[in-house]
Amino acid sequence: MALQIGFLLFPQVQQLDLTGPYDVLASLPDVQVHLVWKDLVPVTSSTGLQLKPTTTFEDCPVLDVICVPGGAGVGPLMEDEQTLDFIRSQAAQARYVTSVCTGSLVLGAAGLLQGKRATTHWAYHDLLPTLGAIPVKDRVVRDGNLFTGGGITAGIDFALTLAQELVGVDTAQLVQLQLEYAPAPPFDSGSPDTAPSAVVDEARKRAAPSLKLRTEITERAAAKLNLR
């Protein structure tokens, strides 16, 4: 039977959180990849791309891999019990529970990060301990069957790491080559540790409203989990 891989799809998802890992994992042999949401109505990503679910919470098969991407829409998801219940149910049966970027905050709101090493987008890293996680500032972090990827583009690194676990290093390397994944960006500003201070300051300024809102939501989620 084909390996069942499911990505949570939701309004205001960060499309690269989803489509980067999707391309990697959908390129593996003998897999079936699902885009899962409450219904089959297309959703709009945070940058305006229309994405169509392929199955619903009700009809989704038992998944071998569940992946929660991040994006502007994670705040509402963290307080959406229908979504959290679906994630918990699938996570209890899945071989691997995974996330990209701020999708790890949703896993945390579902109670799946307690005592676990995890990562997320750098701007929201300090929220992880509130959800019981042990924060690690790596692009990909594994703790048992939990894989979390850092911000946005780290999703490709995450997916290749998971691909190696699923099908072996040779096939994972083949997929990497087929996708010509050999990053060589023109600037060394992809991390707050290497970006110019003025760029970091501007990025933090732009993230501040979202950080404030997500901090409040994270505190409420922690209270529901009796972590506060």
Curated annotation (Swiss-Prot):
Gene3D superfamilies: 3.40.50.880. The active site is at C101. Changing E81Q: Almost no change in activity. It catalyses: N-cyclohexylformamide = cyclohexyl isocyanide + H2O. Keywords: Lyase. Sensitive to thiol reagents and oxidizing reagents, but is not influenced by chelators or reducing reagents. It comes from the Bacteria. Optimum temperature is 35 degrees Celsius. Activity is rapidly lost above 40 degrees Celsius. Optimum pH is 6.0-6.5. The keyword Ribosomal protein does not apply. One of its GO terms (molecular function) is cyclohexyl-isocyanide hydratase activity. The keyword Lyase applies. PANTHER family: ARAC-FAMILY TRANSCRIPTIONAL REGULATOR, DJ-1_PFPI DOMAIN-CONTAINING PROTEIN. Homodimer. This is Isonitrile hydratase. The lineage of its organism: Bacteria, Pseudomonadati, Pseudomonadota, Gammaproteobacteria, Pseudomonadales. The gene is inhA.
